[in-house]
Every structure is written in C-alpha cells, then in structure tokens.
C-alpha cells in the first residue's frame, strides 16, 4: 500500500494527474483482477461499468443478441420500504464482503424476496475478509455451497458442514488458454503450457457446463464458436 501511495504522489509531483493521458495505473492484487472487473464479475454493474439502468440493460441486450423482455422476466420484483415495486434487475446486489448478511440478516432488511440459500466461491478465499465467525455460521446455514479452485481453500474447510458441499477442481493459469487484462488495460494472450491435472477443468468449461445444466447454454454461448 505504501508503494502505491508513493507512486501516486510521485505522479502528482510530476504533474501527470488530472490530465489527458496522465494518471497512475491501478495496481491490482491478483492476476487478471482488472479483466474480471471489466468483464463485470460485480454485483452493482453490467460489463464496462454501465450500471444497472434500463438503458444499460437494453444496450447489452443488443450486444448479446438477446431479447430484453426475456431478460427482464428472469428477475423477481420486490416492494420497497417506500411502497413502490422495484425489479431486482435494476437493484444493486449484495457485495462479496457482505454475502453473510444475505444469509443471516432478516429478509425484510436485505431488499430481496428471500435469504441466500446457495453460494459459489469461485477463485475466492474468505480469509481475505473479516467477520470469519459469522461467515462460518452463514456457511453452515446454506443449503448448497460450491467451491471452485485449483486446490482446496479456506472456503472448503472453514465450516463444519457435512452435506451440500461440492469442490470442483479448476485448472491453473498454465493449464488453460485465454486473455488477461493488465493494470494498464492492455490485453495479453496466454497459451496453454501443460494439460490439466487429474479431473480439473478450465473456468470457461465449468461455466459452460453450469449453463447447459440450467438450460441457457445456447443463449449464453451463441456468439462463441
């Protein structure tokens, strides 16, 4: 963190802040975190940081070649505290740091019809967050918990839950191919170095299998050959 602060202060002293083409690169903590947020693994926005307005959904409906009304029908509605009915389509979701509240909090306080019943931890270890005691309780209250990682993380061993827990082994970066986004927003392509170990699968294969099981793989992958 000190290095990041000093780098920004240095750029400020050089006059490179607040100017066209200036600024400092965003330092991210893990490989391709920038690409993940650009692609929108977020609870509060569509890809490209478009937000969740009706206009944003209509834009991405056109990009995806999807019917806007079909997408809209996939979301539940909820009557807010102001008495107005709101579609969850336009409401910010629960951030990863507070998913615990989605399980343990009274559902009248979480602005969605029901509490969370299932969680998928995909490339995420909860020991990077606080409230571990509450997290353990929340995990044990879930009906379903899925952990997707190259190796078992704290997500897989924190709770004493004995059923409804699945560990899906994913490949490492050396066992698959694909693009990553550097902190300067440049794209880099990586080739597969070795074959996947044991039964592990690349992330894109796992998500395809999920989509196929849920019945919308044809829609999700229609533009991917």
Segment roles from a protein language model:
Residues 1-3:
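Short, small-residue-biased leader/transition segments that mark boundaries at the very start
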Residues 10:
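Conserved hydrophobic/aromatic pocket- or pore-lining residues that grip, position, or stack substrates
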Residues 13-20, 27-40, 44-225:
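Non-catalytic alpha/beta scaffold blocks inside enzyme catalytic domains
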């Amino acid at each position: 963190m000190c290095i990041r602060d000093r780098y920004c202060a240095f750029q400020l002293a050089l006059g490179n802040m607040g100017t066209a083409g200036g600024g400092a690169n965003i330092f991210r903590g893990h490989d391709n975190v920038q690409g993940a947020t650009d692609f929108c693994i977020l609870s509060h926005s569509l890809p490209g940081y478009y937000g969740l307005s009706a206009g944003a959904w209509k834009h991405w409906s056109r990009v995806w070649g999807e019917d806007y009304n079909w997408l809209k029908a996939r979301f539940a509605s909820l009557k807010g505290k102001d008495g107005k009915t709101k579609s969850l389509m336009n409401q910010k979701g629960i951030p990863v740091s507070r998913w615990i509240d989605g399980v343990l909090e009274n559902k009248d306080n979480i602005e969605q019809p029901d509490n969370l019943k299932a969680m998928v931890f995909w490339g995420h270890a909860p020991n990077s967050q606080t409230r571990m005691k509450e997290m353990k309780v929340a995990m044990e209250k879930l009906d379903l918990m899925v952990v997707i990682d190259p190796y078992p993380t704290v997500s897989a061993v924190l709770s004493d839950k004995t059923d409804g827990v699945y560990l899906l082994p994913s490949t490492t970066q050396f066992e698959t191919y694909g693009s990553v986004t550097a902190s300067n927003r440049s794209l880099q392509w990586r080739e597969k170095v070795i074959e996947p170990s044991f039964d592990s699968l690349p992330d894109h294969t796992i998500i395809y299998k999920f989509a196929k099981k849920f019945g919308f793989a044809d829609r999700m992958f229609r533009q991917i050959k």
